[in-house]
Amino acid sequence: MLPAVGSVDEEEDPAEEDCPELVPIETTQSEEEEKSGLGAKIPVTIITGYLGAGKTTLLNYILTEQHSKRVAVILNESGEGSALEKSLAVSQGGELYEEWLELRNGCLCCSVKDNGLRAIENLMQKKGKFDDILLETTGLADPGAVASMFWVDAELGSDIYLDGIITIVDSKYGLKHLTEEKPDGLINEATRQVALADIILINKTDLVPEEDVKKLRTTLRSINGLGQILETQRSRVDLSNVLDLHAFDSLSGISLQKKLQHVPGTQPHLDQSIVTITFDVPGNAKEEHLNMFIQNLLWEKNVRNKDNHCMEVIRLKGLVSIKDKSQQVIVQGVHELCDLEETPVSWKDDTERTNRLVLIGRNLDKDILKQLFIATVTETEKQWTTHFKEDQVCT
C-alpha cells in the first residue's frame, strides 16, 4: 500500500477515532418480527476518499450521534486501521473475521479486511435491525469496482440496492492528491473517486483559507459536473445529504430529469484531462443499439478522440427514449457495468422525445461521442464505424 501523502496533521484526529460505546447484539426472532418492512430492499451507500480525508470521522459521527437512523456501518480500511477498527477486528485461529456490534444509538458496526461482500451477506441475517448500510472503502480503492459487485452478486440482488457513492476530499491536501502523477498514464485514485461520486464532501474547510476551498471546488467541478458538492468540518453533515439518494435506480428519474437540464460541460483543469461532457439527441434509440454504444465505450474502450487518444468513460448517466417504450429510461454506467431501467415518468404526447447523456471520463470528445450516438440511434449495428476515420477506432 502507498503511504499517505502529507504531514502528520493529515491523519484523522485521534479523538475522533475513539471507539464508541458498544453493546453485544442479542437478536431474537420476535424482535426482528416486530420490525417493519422486512421485505424491502436495503440501500447501500459507498463512502470513499483518499487516505486521511475523513471517512472514519464521518462514520464515527454517524455511529455515535443521536439521529434516529438505524445504520449498519462496515469499516473496510486496510493496514493498521483506527482505534474503532482495532476494537472490532476479531482474530480467531489466526484469521480475521467480522463481528457485528450494536451501538447505543441503534446503529450496527463491524470491521472487515476484504471487499465487504461477505459482511453484507452475513448482515442480511440481521435484516430488520437496520434501515441503511454504509460501506467504507480503503483510501486507495476504486469505488467503481466496489459498486459493481452490488450489480452482479445475484444472492444479494433481492436484498439490497446501491444508493449512491460519497467521496470525501481533504480541503488541505485534496489538490495535491488530485494532481499526483501515476505511471503509464493511469488515473490516480483520488481523481477516479471524485469522478464516480454522487456527493462530494470537501472536508476540513476550517483548516484552510476560503480561497483554497474555492480553488479546490473549481477543480472538483471540472472533474465531475454532475455530483453535488458540499463543504464540511470534521465530516459533520446532515444525513439526508448522504442517505436515500436513489442515485442508481428509477426513483431518481424525475429529479434526474431536472438535474440533467443544468449539467454544464467542463474543461480539464488537471493533467489527467478528466472532464464532464453532456449532449442531447432527439428521437428514439433501439435498445440493442444503445447497448452497443455503451459496450464500445465501457467494455471495448475502442473509440479515439481527435488527438488519437482512447476515450475512457468512468461514469455514465442519462435519460433516454427507447423505441416502443412509453416510459423514460434511466441509463447508468460504472466500471464497465451498465444498467437500463424504466422510470415512473412517461413521455408526454406533445413533447419531443430526446436523449440526454452525461459522461465523465478522460480524453472525451463531445462531438465524436454525439456523432457516435446519433449513428447508433438511426442506423444499423454494422454501420457505426463508417462515421470515423480508421485511426479513431481503438484496437
UniProtKB/Swiss-Prot annotation:
Keywords: Chaperone, GTP-binding, Hydrolase, Metal-binding, Nucleotide-binding, Nucleus, Zinc. GTP binds at residues 49-56, 110-114, 203-206. It comes from the Eukaryota. A motif (CXCC motif) lies at residues 107-110. CDD domains: CobW-like (cd03112). Residues 274-377 form the CobW C-terminal domain. Belongs to the SIMIBI class G3E GTPase family. ZNG1 subfamily. This is Zinc-regulated GTPase metalloprotein activator 1F. The gene is ZNG1F.
